């Protein structure tokens, strides 16, 4: 199970390139490296399940989460593309997108806030940091219940390719699906008029 976690929080302009790279290194390249190491064993035995913990931040972008969402969106694309590559060998994948769970993610050990350097962001930064710090230890999701749910899902003959973990995650999934459909329909005529005439 891939479950690396840290959080560089802040507005994009105030996050350093090094912080963004570190975020991607941990959240994306870390799981990639672990998976690359275990796939030969799974291919040899012609079975396996690669479980990767993503986030609702991999489904929809969020304020103050540019580095984190970049890495999580990367995980989503990587796993979606990896799935058909390894399916012929009996290997399945499962993405887990949790909402807010009462983990250590928002503690000072796991979250690094960007240094405020731009006045235009100062007020909002102060408000967001205060809100998130007050949320630490009060998140609604129970990690123990999530662990039990994952045990149930992993035991299934056909585990789901995606699992929205938490009521807030279900809401994020539904809102994103509705938004994508609305955007596709809004410019449907223009979108479908872009082919060559002889195509």
Give residue spans per PLM region.
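Active-site loop immediately N-terminal to the catalytic Tyr-X3-Lys motif
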Residues: 13, 60-67
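Conserved NAD(P)H cofactor-binding loop of Rossmann-fold oxidoreductase domains
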Residues: 3-8
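SDR active-site lid
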Residues: 88-160
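Active-site helix of classical SDR
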Residues: 35, 71
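Residue(s) in the substrate-gating loop at a strand-loop-helix junction
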Residues: 55
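Substrate-binding pocket helix/loop in short-chain dehydrogenase/reductase
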Residues: 11-12, 19-21
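Active-site-adjacent segment of SDR/Rossmann-fold oxidoreductases
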Residues: 60, 81-92
């Amino acid at each position: 199970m891939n479950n690396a976690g840290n959080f560089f929080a802040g507005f994009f302009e105030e996050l350093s390139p090094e912080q963004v790279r570190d975020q991607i290194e941990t959240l994306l390249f870390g799981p990639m490296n672990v998976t690359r190491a275990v796939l030969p064993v799974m291919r040899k035995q012609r079975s396996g399940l690669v479980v990767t913990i993503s986030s609702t931040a991999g489904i929809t972008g969020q304020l103050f989460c540019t580095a984190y969402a970049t890495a999580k969106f990367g995980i989503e694309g990587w796993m979606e593309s990896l799935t058909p590559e390894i399916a012929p060998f009996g290997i399945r994948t499962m993405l887990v997108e949790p909402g807010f769970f009462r983990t250590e993610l928002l503690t000072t050990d796991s979250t690094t806030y960007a240094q405020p350097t731009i006045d235009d962001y100062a007020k909002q930064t102060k408000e967001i940091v205060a809100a998130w710090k007050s949320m630490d230890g009060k998140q609604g999701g129970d990690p123990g219940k999530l662990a039990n749910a994952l045990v149930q899902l992993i035991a299934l003959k056909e585990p789901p390719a995606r699992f929205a973990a938490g009521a807030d995650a279900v809401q994020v999934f539904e809102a994103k699906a509705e938004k994508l459909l609305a955007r596709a329909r809004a410019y449907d005529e223009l979108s479908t008029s872009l082919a060559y005439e002889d195509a």
